[in-house]
Each structure stands twice: as C-alpha cells, then as structure tokens.
Amino acid sequence: MARVVFGNHSAVRVPRAEKDRIRQFYRDVLGCTIMREGDQKDDFRLGDNFYIAFLYEDEDAVLDESGFSKAIYLELKTDDVGEMRRKIAAFGVTVLDVPDPHLYFQAPGGQVLRLVGIDEDLSRYEGTEHGEQFVGGAFTVRADGDTPPL
C-alpha cells in the first residue's frame, strides 16, 4: 500500500499589509532565517528542516483572522516553552481561548499556532496515550483488554 507523509515545505496566503509584522515576528521572535525576501513572497526556514513561504496577497484573496481560527493550526516546538511564551506575548499576538493547556495564538497574517515543548509527551493527541497501537490502518485494543476512552 502506498504511504503518505507531510513534507517539510508549506505556504500560506497572507495579507500584504502584514508583511513587515510577519518578517519581524518570524525572524526576531521565532528565530527563523529569511532564505529569500521579495515583494510577493518571503521564504523562511524554521529550525533545521522546515520551510514556509508567505505569499503576500490583497485582503480579498486571503482568509481573515476568524477564517484561520476555524481552519487549521500549525504546531511550534521549542526547547524552552516559558521563554518562547514570554517572547510571543511581548510581541503582541492574539491569544486564543482553547480548552487545552498549550498556548494557541494567531501570528501576524492570521495563522493559528500551538506552542509545545520539544520533548513533551503528546500521545494524548495521537490516540496512543492509553496503550493502544496503530497497526495496519486500525487502532488495536490495549493489552489489558479495555477499550480506550474517547
């Protein structure tokens, strides 16, 4: 059976008016490297091997902030959650009220990001926190025979 995984390149359409704040946030707060800077598009490297392009568009061609909050979030991993949380808050982003212990916020341009620790156990989000295993396209029951809670 063919296998599929997410790649390490992403792109987001964002309002052209947010270009300076996007550059400042991703470069100065998150520590990204701007690989290529342009009028219509910027390419950033985040960490060792993740690339994200920001495609600068007119307002009517992009999601507004409420659209992003209803769509998808990206996860940011850091080796110092407390320090990064302070830097993000000091920049002045919109913090979202999500029933989860992690920081969810909207970065400049509207993207929703979740901040977690690099070594944090995230098995509760993977459906594997109660001992079940993903085998051949289906979850198996725990070794003790109980079905995991939903």
PLM regions: where:
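Short, flexible helix/strand-to-coil boundary loops that buttress conserved ligand/catalytic motifs
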Residues: Y26, I88, E126
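Conserved positions at the start
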Residues: G7, K41, D100-H102
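Conserved short beta-strand elements that form part of the metal-binding/catalytic scaffold
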Residues: T33-F68, V112-S123
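N-terminal beta-strand motif that seeds the catalytic metal site of vicinal oxygen chelate
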Residues: M1-R23, A71-L74, D121-L150
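Vicinal oxygen chelate
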Residues: V14-D20, S69-V112, G117-E120
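Conserved acetyl-CoA-binding loop of GNAT-fold acetyltransferases
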Residues: R27-M35, G92-T94
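A general structural signal for short secondary-structure boundary/capping elements
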Residues: F54-A61, G92, L103-Y104, V116-Y125, ...
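Short secondary-structure transition/capping segments
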Residues: L46-D48, Q106-G110, E126, H130
